[in-house]
Structure formats: C-alpha cells, structure tokens
C-alpha cells in the first residue's frame, strides 16, 4: 500500500483535462453570479427547474444514498463484513450532499437567502422546508460520520474516539433523515398532476423515490468501489482488497431484490391507474426503455452475476443501475414534465448549464481523490486498527 506520492508528476492527461474543466467552470460561475441566471441558462416561467435540479440535486441526492445504505448494513444490521465499504461510501455521500448544496446556489435567484427557511421564514407546511431541513441536518450528520478519517489523519485521537462512540446514533439519524427527504423529493411532484405525464405521475411517487434511492445507493457503492479498485488500488490495504468482492456480491444480491420489487410496484401502479393505453405512444416507448432496460435488465444481471459468481456482470449491472436512476430523475423532472407543451416551448439545457454541472461532478471527483490519497478512507490507519 502506497499513500500520496509527492514526487509523481501532476502533468498527466487526466489532471490536465480536470484542470481545464475546473477553470472553465470557474469562468461560468463568475458569469452566473455577475450576469444572472438568464445569461447562462434556458430556464423560463414554463421551465423553472432544469438540469441543476434534475441532475445536480435529484440525481446527486439519490446517488449519495450509498452512505445510509452501507452504514445501516454494517452498524444496524450487523453485517460487519461490509465495514471496509463504510468510509468510502460515507465520503462519497458527504461530498455528494455538500456539492448538492453548492449546486443549489446556482439555481437560486437569491443564493444568499438559502438559509432563510431554517432561520427566518420556516414555512413548516411546505415540503421544500422539510427537504431543506433534512438535507441540512443530514449533511451535518455525514460530516460527523466522515470526520474520524480526518481526525486520524491529523492525529487527534481523543476527539476521534469521542466521535466514533456516536456511530450508532449517527447511523440511526442518517437512516431516518434519508427516508424523509428521499421520499419528499418525490412528493414535490404530487402537486403537478396535470404537468407530469401519467406514466410517471403517481400518488406513490414518494415511495418510488425512496425505494429507487436504495437501488442508487447499492449500485453506486459497487460502481464507485470498482473505479477505486482500478484507479486507487495501490492505496488499499489487505482488508479492503480481501473484502472488496464480498461487498460486490452482497450489495449486488440486495440490489437485485430491490429492483425486482421496484419493478413490480411500478407495474401495479400503472395497472391501478389504468394507464396501459399510454404505452402505445412515444412516451410509452420511453417508459418501457426505462423499466425494461434500466430496471428489469439490471435486476436480472445482478441475480445472474451473484449466482454464477461473475463479478464483471455485477459491475456492469451497477452501471445500468446508476444510469437508470439518472434516467428516472431526468424523466420525472424534465422529459415527462410539461409534456403537453409544444416542442418549441419545451426545455433544453444551455451549454453553460451543462458546463456547470460537469464542473460540479469534476469537483466532487477531484476532492474525493485528494481525500482518499491522504486520509485513511481506502485503508485502515495502522494506529487505529483495533479502535473501532
């Protein structure tokens, strides 16, 4: 195992591309906050939410669900064999939620008023208040859950030991808060039955969003672990290397069952609402692509990979699972929203909107690499191996 190599050249193709994206992102950020939202986006009165909400927020929150899924598996359900996956998952979740809040500032007309719902005008009957309160609280919980890695790196043993004793309480808080805001993000669309296509609109949207967040968390842990195993293999210790395949098989099995259940309740929902006739339309074909290609197929591939012990199949299924979550959030927030409007009034993101979203994702990856290459995330600190 090797840690950060300060002698290694920073002028690699990957770092150069990353640097270009970050510089362009900073330029677009300056334009956004000096010229206004209209200068860098195609948002309007018909389409007030674009990819900054549909991708950066809805997808970001869902894909960061690996934090509560992994910590609950290890600390609440006693599956200690997944302990090595907890810190990478918590780190990803913490960065995901942190940059969700960062990205939200781009979408707000008055970014400085972001804390208003918490400290000035609560609006306690609003779902957005509940989402904002839960996300802010859960971000704090994630920071505390992640902090032992930083404290071990800094050598602050006493503070670290105090924080570790709070693990179980923090995990319970994390699961409760995640259940609330993951489902509430789906509930936001309940107020727009005439704007959201019937195949995606349902009174069970909160349930769908929560269950699909579990799929996102399980798939993201496998996907992220596969990337880390390939690109940061030299930073892992023997425990992480030995337990990596077990995490893939265990989470793959769980994802297969959750996806199968999700598929069944989606079919039941369409049946209850008598929406089958919409399948003969273009939107119906797109719904079938989502359900068959990114729900049923990955569920089958997860089951096949686990049964046949084919780790490559499971990793491919995790890619489909992640893409399926992105596709679902895009469909609900963008593609199937305002479906009745003429084509010339529909929303398509400005290239600067896309550029800012790419900047946010690149920032997450860059910060994760910085943390993982210096702090005990992919390995156990030798001074704390017996102090869990």
Curated annotation (Swiss-Prot):
InterPro entries: FDH_cytochrome_b556_subunit, NrfD-like, sulf_resp_HmcC
Transmembrane residue ranges: 10-31, 57-78, 89-106, 130-144, 166-191, 199-222, 254-265, 291-306, 316-328, 354-368
Membrane-related topology note: Multi-pass membrane protein
Cysteine disulfide links: none
Gene Ontology CC entries for this record: plasma membrane
Family label: Belongs to the NrfD family.
Stored NCBIfam families: sulf_resp_HmcC
Protein name per Swiss-Prot or TrEMBL: Protein DVU_0534
Species for this entry: Nitratidesulfovibrio vulgaris (strain ATCC 29579 / DSM 644 / CCUG 34227 / NCIMB 8303 / VKM B-1760 / Hildenborough) (Desulfovibrio vulgaris)
């Amino acid at each position: 195992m090797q840690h950060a190599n300060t002698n290694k050249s920073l002028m690699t193709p990957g770092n150069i591309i990353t640097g270009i994206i970050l510089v362009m992102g900073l330029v677009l950020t300056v334009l956004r906050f000096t010229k206004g939202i209209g200068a860098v986006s195609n948002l309007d009165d018909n389409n007030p939410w674009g990819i900054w909400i549909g991708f950066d927020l809805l997808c970001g929150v869902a894909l960061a669900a690996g934090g509560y899924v992994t910590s609950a598996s290890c600390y609440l359900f006693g599956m200690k064999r997944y302990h090595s996956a907890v810190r990478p998952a918590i780190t990803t979740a913490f960065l995901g939620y942190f940059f969700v809040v960062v990205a939200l500032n781009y979408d707000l007309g008055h970014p400085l008023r972001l804390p208003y719902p918490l400290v000035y005008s609560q609006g306690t009957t609003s779902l957005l208040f509940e989402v904002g309160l839960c996300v802010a609280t859960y971000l704090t919980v994630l920071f505390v859950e992640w902090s032992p890695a930083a404290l071990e790196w800094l050598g602050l043993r006493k503070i670290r030991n105090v924080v570790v004793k709070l693990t179980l309480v923090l995990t319970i808080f994390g699961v409760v808060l995640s259940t609330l805001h993951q489902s509430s993000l789906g509930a936001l669309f309940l107020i727009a039955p005439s704007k959201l296509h019937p195949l995606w609109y349902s009174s069970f949207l909160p349930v769908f969003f929560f269950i699909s967040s579990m799929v996102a968390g399980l798939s993201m842990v496998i996907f992220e672990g596969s990337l880390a195993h390939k690109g940061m293999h030299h930073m892992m210790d023997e425990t992480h290397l030995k337990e990596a395949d077990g995490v893939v098989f265990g989470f793959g099995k769980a994802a297969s069952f959750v996806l199968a259940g999700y598929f069944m309740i989606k079919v039941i929902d369409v049946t209850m609402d008598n929406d089958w006739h919409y399948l003969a339309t273009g939107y119906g074909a797109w719904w079938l692509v989502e359900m068959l290609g990114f729900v049923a197929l990955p569920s089958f591939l997860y089951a096949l990979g686990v049964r046949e012990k084919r780790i490559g199949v499971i990793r491919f299924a995790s890619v489909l699972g992640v893409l399926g979550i992105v596709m679902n959030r895009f469909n609900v927030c963008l593609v199937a929203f305002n479906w009745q409007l003429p084509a010339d009034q529909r929303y398509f993101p400005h290239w600067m909107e896309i550029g800012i979203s790419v900047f946010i994702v690149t920032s997450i990856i860059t910060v994760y690499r910085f943390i993982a290459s210096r702090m005990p995330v992919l390995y156990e600190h030798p001074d704390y191996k017996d102090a869990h």
